[in-house]
């Protein structure tokens, strides 16, 4: 019996480690690098055109594994609906996602003497990405490695550790999307790196435009409007939108220019020793 349990457990671990290309292809173009899971080729399959239901069919267990993955990576409810909606039998998973998201709407991060909700924290994630914040900077700013002296301090530290991990997930997601778009430029130049003014533009064209805008000192807020972020959006929806990689790219280019124009810090100038 024990051996049987070990075999089943090992099988489950192997199952959850498999990337299902069929499901990934079903959500291609959504602008993310999620890994989607399956049990076997027969479990996840597209319903035939003659079938009564559209989308993909999968076991409830597999769909819930995907839902849990979306929750772990801090995707918004609207984005979870978009992804899970690719399945014909997704309603139960959506209900579970809604339930779990409601439970984590408080104590997501502690900043400026108050606990933030998930949406407020993710708004900070957007700011950090545009500022180029690194893991080391955040760990230093949040004083992650100081031993907490009270239960409240310990809770604050644990909450902020989780927030930093969530932010790093966003950075990994952004790097993967940026890399994929870079590869698209060489494999299929018709794929757009960004879309605005009713047209899709290639990566080379966008970077050329960005170079000109940086030289003129075009503000980030102006580029934000050009890329279609002028309407109120939830931070997670903004992050997962198709133009966000371009937006973050311009922010980085602008930072690099501004940093190059700053005079050197006095404490960083080496002095000859006597």
Curated annotation (Swiss-Prot):
Signal sequence coordinates: 1-21
Motif RxLR-dEER location, chain numbering: 35-53
Domain of life per record: Eukaryota
Protein's cellular compartments: Secreted; Host nucleus; Host cytoplasm
The keyword Glycoprotein belongs to this UniProt entry's keyword annotation: yes
Keywords from the UniProt entry: Glycoprotein, Host cytoplasm, Host nucleus, Secreted, Signal, Virulence
UniProt-annotated glycosylation sites, renumbered to this chain: 41, 74, 258
Location (main, coarse): secreted
A cellular component annotation (GO) from this entry: extracellular region
Function, as annotated: Secreted effector that completely suppresses the host cell death induced by cell death-inducing proteins.
Family stated for the protein in its record: Belongs to the RxLR effector family.
Name by which UniProt lists this protein: Secreted RxLR effector protein 40
Species per Swiss-Prot/TrEMBL record: Plasmopara viticola (Downy mildew of grapevine)
């Amino acid at each position: 019996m024990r051996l049987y349990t070990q075999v089943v457990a090992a099988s489950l671990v192997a199952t959850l480690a498999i990337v299902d290309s069929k499901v990934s292809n079903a959500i291609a173009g959504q602008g993310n690098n999620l890994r989607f899971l399956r049990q076997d080729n027969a479990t996840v399959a597209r319903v035939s055109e003659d079938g009564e239901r559209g989308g993909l069919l999968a076991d409830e267990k597999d769909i819930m594994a995907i839902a849990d993955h979306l929750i772990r990576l801090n995707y918004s409810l609207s984005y979870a609906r978009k992804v899970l909606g690719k399945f014909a039998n997704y309603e139960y998973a959506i209900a579970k996602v809604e339930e779990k998201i409601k439970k984590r709407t408080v104590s997501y991060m502690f900043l400026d003497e108050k606990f933030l909700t998930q949406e407020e924290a993710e708004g900070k994630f957007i700011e950090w990405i545009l500022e180029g914040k690194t893991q080391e900077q955040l760990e230093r700013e949040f004083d992650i490695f100081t031993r907490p002296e009270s239960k409240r301090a310990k809770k604050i530290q644990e909450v902020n550790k989780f927030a930093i991990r969530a932010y790093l997930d966003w950075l990994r997601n952004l790097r993967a999307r940026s890399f994929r778009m870079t590869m698209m430029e060489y494999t299929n130049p018709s794929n757009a790196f960004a879309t605005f003014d009713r047209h899709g533009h290639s990566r080379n064209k966008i970077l050329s435009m960005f170079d000109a805008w940086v030289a003129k000192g075009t503000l980030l807020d102006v580029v934000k409007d050009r890329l279609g972020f002028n309407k109120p959006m939830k931070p997670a929806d903004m992050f997962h939108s198709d133009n966000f990689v371009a937006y973050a790219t311009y922010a980085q280019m602008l930072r690099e220019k501004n940093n190059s124009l700053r005079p050197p810090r006095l404490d960083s100038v080496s002095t000859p020793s006597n």
